[in-house]
Design a protein with these regions (language model features):
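A short, surface-exposed alpha-helical micro-motif characterized by mixed small hydrophobic
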Residues: 62-64
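Short, glycine/charged-rich "phosphate-handling" switch motifs in NTP-dependent
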Residues: 68, 80
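Hydrophobic anchor residue at the start of the ABC signature
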Residues: 10
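C-terminal boundary and immediately downstream tail of ABC-type ATPase nucleotide-binding domains
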Residues: 71-72, 88-105
Length: 105
């Protein structure tokens, strides 16, 4: 499946011992259990000192494991902060739920 290919691609990238890892939706196509595995793995990679830049649709999950997060609105940087700050920011929640326009920043 596409999700399994994601996990294999991540493993192959890690074999190169990178200092920075770029991930494009690492949980895409995975079952909920495998999504948990993917996020645990990303968290472990980050804790091991590998800078991880991730694009992810599952904002809540992503912000739970990241040190810093950036929320884009119409391709522009709208908000930046710790995961906790962003998860508690009403404007970010509004953007995520689609209840705020592009002038939310």
């Amino acid at each position: 499946s596409g999700g399994e290919r994601q996990m294999v691609a991540m493993s192959r990238a890690l074999m190169m011992d990178p200092s920075v890892l770029l991930l494009d939706e690492p949980s895409a196509g995975l079952s909920p259990v495998r999504q948990d595995d993917a996020f645990i793995r990303v968290s472990d990679i980050n804790k091991a000192g590998v800078t991880t830049i991730m694009v992810e649709q599952n904002a809540r999950r992503c912000l739970q494991i990241c040190d810093r997060g950036y929320v884009l609105d119409q391709g522009k940087d709208a908000h930046e902060g710790t995961g906790r700050d962003l998860l508690n920011d009403p404007k970010v929640i509004g953007l995520y739920l689609g209840t705020l326009g592009t002038d939310a920043a």
